[in-house]
Structure formats: structure tokens, C-alpha cells
Amino acid sequence: MGVVLFHLFGDGRVSGGIDVFLAISGFLFTGMLLREAAEHGHIRITRYLGRLARRILAPAALVIAATTAAGLLILPTTRHDQLVAEARASLLYVENVELIRSQLSYEAAGPETSPFQHFWSLSVQGQFYLVWPALVLLAVWLARRTGRSAAATMSLLVATVFLGSFLWALHHQGINQAEAYLMSGTRAWELAFGSLLALLGAHLRLPQPLRTPAAWTGLGLVVSCGFVLDGAALFPGPWALWPLLGLALLMAAASAPSRTADRSPVAPPPIRFLATRPLARLGDLAYGLYLWHWPALIIHLELTGAEGLDAGGAVVVLVFSLAAAWATHRWVETPLAKWGAPTGTSGTIDAGRERRLHRTTLSLAAGTLALGAAAGTVHLQLTTTPQEGGWATEGLDRQVYPGATVSASSPPGHSADDDVAPFPDLVGMSRRVPEYATRDCHQRTGDDPGTSEVLLCEDPREPHDARLSIMLAGGSHAGHWQHAWLMLAEEHDWEILVATKGGCVFRHIEDHEHNQCGAWNADFAAMLDQRQPDVVVTPGTRIPRDGGEESIVDGAQDRWQEITDAGAQLLLVRGTPRQLTNVPDCLASGGDAHSCAPEVDRFAETDPLEDAELPAGTATVDLTDVVCPQGRCSAVIGNVVVYRDSHHLTNEYVETAAPLLEEKLRETMPQLFDSGDTGAEEPPAEGAADRMTGAQRGDQSR
């Protein structure tokens, strides 16, 4: 319940409830499996899987089906491919893996957040349920061979899992916090913690005077966690022990209640409070409430168009989720539980009925999982991009889809045929990234330790002795022009390199230790001395993502000076217009090319680079009129979609803009083109460095 309340009323803060949930899962299942294995020498796998299917998979499958149907009806078509992928992943209990694969970190709810994001923790739990029986059987087998008790052997194995996973979580947090938060390997220690509570329960008994203080302390630790700690940044590291130790204290306080004068057991007040009928009833609905609340929240935000949830919206989502959880418990969970429950005075299930029950349950489970796998196959077939192995615009009719080269006398979005659908298709747009981003050489956004390393993307074409080496560097806005540069490179014998870090522009930052962008800037200077490109191309201005006017980033000139001091020619490109909302989503939701366009008034009246103090020899190029012809921005130009999200250009539009980029470069940097090129103003000199004139390069030398 705490997880739900923090999601709805706490701006999505991590409450620690998931950590407690995982520990309780380990507590309950370890004890149950160990008792069965010790008694029978094995685990009745069909009964075990059938019980899981009835109690866990069936309600989850219902919510997944309902969420998928609602999402396909309500969410923009641009999000359908990811929706189906995550529905399949949730059904197969690998949603945490899908979120990592898709580079979607755990975050507070917003208009573009996945409605299946909360299934990551259920996926960790489901993977535990499939793996843990093998560990229990191993413990029983080892116990019989060594003469030790199964509980003692299991305790040793679980302690090993706990220690290994805890150390792995600690290590991986320093590499990638977003992945560490979602990975099963870094979460296993929390499940092992609960398992150890089950195995060592007999040793958790507290002296009577300590039980009530321990219960209050434990409850305080669990409840306060979400208010005190930033779980999204700290978990599953050592700070996750905060709520887990609270759980341990509560269990220790409840394990042996105090007794009155007549020897009647009396639990400490916090335990009695948690066992009251209303809370017990709410506990019956907890699983369904958790399943329903997140998709209800995301659908509510989509329907209302809100960026976040206010108090009124939170109440609406909570009431709906409670009603849906009650209905699920009443008509799904309870009937399935009764279906598999023992009957008759003996408390056992008739053997024939048990076999039919298990066959039916497992058939339903297998069918559900097969459906998930089939959905994934269809999804992959539908969303495979056609640009692999060639240009995104290869074979495109440029008469129908002129893109950026549409006639200057035509309005933005002009088409020879008004009925022509924009290119490319909006579905899967977010995955149509530039070529370099498909390789493991783009440094990710954020301040996770280890993200300061400069990763260099080599030219994707066959190695050759290029006439000039040109490096696109800085944030991703430098990289999204890659395809246009590659097109020109084929014609003019250039080598195109890319060195980017998401969200990081060139600027001077003192605190390198705690700011990975600052450290990346410093490392870039060292890399520049080693690689020595002839030209470095980087954005010169920036429009803040949360509003504000275009400007030069503070401290950028210092880094630009370092680049020219290293002997490279610097080319500054004016920043790309930015929209506050996702452009393909806007188009898919019924918006037109004008209403979904970036806000042109966020541009400075004149290019800030014109009056700025720049390093000697720096060249500048303004591509604003390429993205916003005639001073008017549009989401679709020449029947080609301009943006793949709110601020990155599509590969397709960038490729149509290559001729316009060449025109601009011939005006600004004619020395890039050799004497054989039309429009060249001077013959080439010997050596790549000598091709830069003194006027462009300034007084610097290599």
C-alpha cells in the first residue's frame, strides 16, 4: 500500500515498499519450499507451478491484457511497439530485462512513462520463484550427504547468495545505477534477506521488554524510508537495509508475543494495529491494487494531458484501482484459490481431481506464456526498421518526399499530393536513431560513475586514408546530423567520427568528481590530443529543455578555446529548435504539422554566436532555416517528419538536408572541399592540416 500511496501522492518517490515486498516473498517461499522438500525429498513441481499460476500469473495476465487493450486504444500509435514489447516482457516475467534493454530507467510517472513499468519488481519475484526451488533441492541433497540439517545447509547457501548479490549491487551502483536498480542479480540479496529471516526465525525471539520498542522502531523505519531516502538513487545498495531492518524488527517483535497474567498472548501495539481487520482486508487487495494502480495512473495522465498527478487525480486513480483490485480479488483470485483448495473432512484433494486441476492450470499457464512469446515475435516482425544496411531514405521518391529540399517558395509541409502520408511511419520512431547510436560508442546521459569516459565512434565505412578527419562532438545534438555528414563524406573523401555524451555540451565545470559531464569534458581534451581531428563540429547554442530562451552555455568558450589550442578547426552549429512535447506522439494523437511544431519564439532574435567572443578562426553555421524554413517551424516538411522525439531530428529528414548543409559549409568553410569540387575557392594544400587557411585556423598551430 505504501508503494501505491507514494506513487500517487508522493510524486513517484521510492518508498522502500518494493524492497520489503521482495524480502517478504523470500521469507514466505523459502519456508514453504524447504518444508516440502524436507518432507518429500523433492518439490512437487506441477503443484508448485500450478499454485503460482493461479495466485500470481492469472491476475497479472488479466491486468496485462486490459492494459494492452487500453493502451492500443488510448496511447499514440508511436508508443504501440514498446507497449506490446513490454506487455510480452511482463507476461514472461522479464520486464526488468526489457526496461534495461530499452534504456528506460525507473522514474516517476509522466505522460511518456510505460504503463508496465511496475512489472519490473514482479519480474524479479517471478524469476526468484523459478530459480529458488533448485537451490532448495540442492540444500536438501547436500544435507543428506553431509548429515547436516536442511535448514542449516540452506542457510549457508542463502547467505552466500546474499553476500554475492549485495557486493554485486554495491559494485554495479558505481557503474550504472539505473541498471542496478532493475537487475535481478543486484536484487537477489533482498530476497535472500527474507529467506534468512525464515530460516533463522527461531533465533529472532526478543526479550519481552524489547518487543514493543522493536516493533515501533521497525514500523518507523519502514514508514519513514520514503520520506528520508532517495531510493531511486540509493537502492538496492546498503541503504536498502533501512526498510529491511525495519521488517526484521517487526518480525522479531511478532514472533513471540507477550503474555498477560492468564498467559494469553498479546502482540505489541504496532503488530496488533497491522493485524486489524481493515488492514488485513486491505492486505487481501494489495496484490491487485499494485497491479492496477500504475496503468491506471499512466492512462489517466494520457487522457487528461497532464504532466503530473494532482491530489484530485490521485484520488480518482486510487478509487478506480481499489475497485479494480476488489473485483479482481472477488472474481479471479478467490475462485482460483477455492478451485485448488483441499475439500472434504480429510483436508486433501482427490487424486483424480488434483491431476485434472494441475493439467488445466499448467495448460492455461503454458498457453498464456506461449501467447506472450507469439506477441513478441509479431512485435519484432512489425517493428523491424527498413534502414538497416543502407540510408534511411534509400529508394525514396524525392519528388513526393523532398524533405528539407522542398521549394523555398512552398510553405512548410508542402506536398505535390496532400494525401501523401508523412515519411517515415510514426510507429517505432523513437528507435530510429542515428547510425552511431546503434553501436556501443555513445556515452549515456547522467552522472552515474563511469559515464565520463569518452567513447569514440569510428567512421562506419571501410577504413581508408581520408582527405580530412571531421569529428562531431558534444551532446546528442551534434550526433543527430551524422547521416548528412556521412553523405557528404562519401562525395568529398572525409572521415566522420562521433564523440558524444547524452545531455552534455562543452562547458567548464570544476567539480569533475561529482559531475560526469565535467569529467567527460576534461577527458575529451586528452582524447583530442591523441586523435587530432582536422575539424571538430559541435552545437554552439542551446535551448533549455524546460523552457527559456536560446543562449550560449556558460563556460563553453573555455572548452572551445582548448579545442582550437589543440590545433583543430572549430565549427559551431546553432542549436536545434526544441519542442516541449514528443512530436511523433503529437502527430499520432491527431495533431497537425503546425500544432506539433517547435516554438520558434524560443529562439533568440539573432544568432547568439554572431556577437560572441569566439576563439580565433572559429567558423559558425546557422541551420535554423533548414529546420524552420522561412522562419516557420513545422513537424513535417516536404512530407518528411522532422523530429523523432521532442528535440532530435529524424535520420530521414537529416539525409534530405545534406545538400543544404553542403551549401552552408561551402559558404562558411570552403577549405573543406578540394579543388575538384564545384564551388571550391582555393586549391588543396599538402597535408590535412595545411588545408585549413590561416584565417580560419587563426594563429594556432599543431
Regions found by a protein language model. Give the residues of each.
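Membrane-interface helix/loop caps of multi-pass membrane proteins
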Residues: 1-358, 367-369, 679
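Extracellular/periplasmic envelope-modification machinery, especially enzymes
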Residues: 231, 304-308, 322, 330, ...
